[in-house]
Amino acid sequence: MSDSIFEEDMTMPKAYIISSYRKISDPEKLAAYAKLAGPAIMAAGGRFLARGVAAKAMEDGRLDRTVIIEFDSLEAAMATYDSAPYQEALAALGNAVERDMRVVEGVA
């Protein structure tokens, strides 16, 4: 039991970047992006939780390539996205893919 009724759980919720690739028009550029993006994300503390084509689509789902990356916080996820190493990876990707990319905060 806590000694103080004023103590709060200061744990920040984790954040997840979720990318779903609707179309891959240049696999070589995607490979160049992956070679740069993976190390940039991991160096910033990101953890790949899932990566690959969906095993099954339900309701209106699609069998797209999907990537889920966990970060310790929303701020860490956004700092990684905005970082110079990740921006270099995005430049290598160019317009090689059409994807839906979003950041979702976890439940604290």
Residue ranges and their predicted role:
Residues 2-65, 72-82, 105-108:
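Short S/T/G/P-rich N-terminal loop/turn motif that feeds into the first structured element of a domain
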Residues 77-102:
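C-terminal structural segments of small proteins and small subunits
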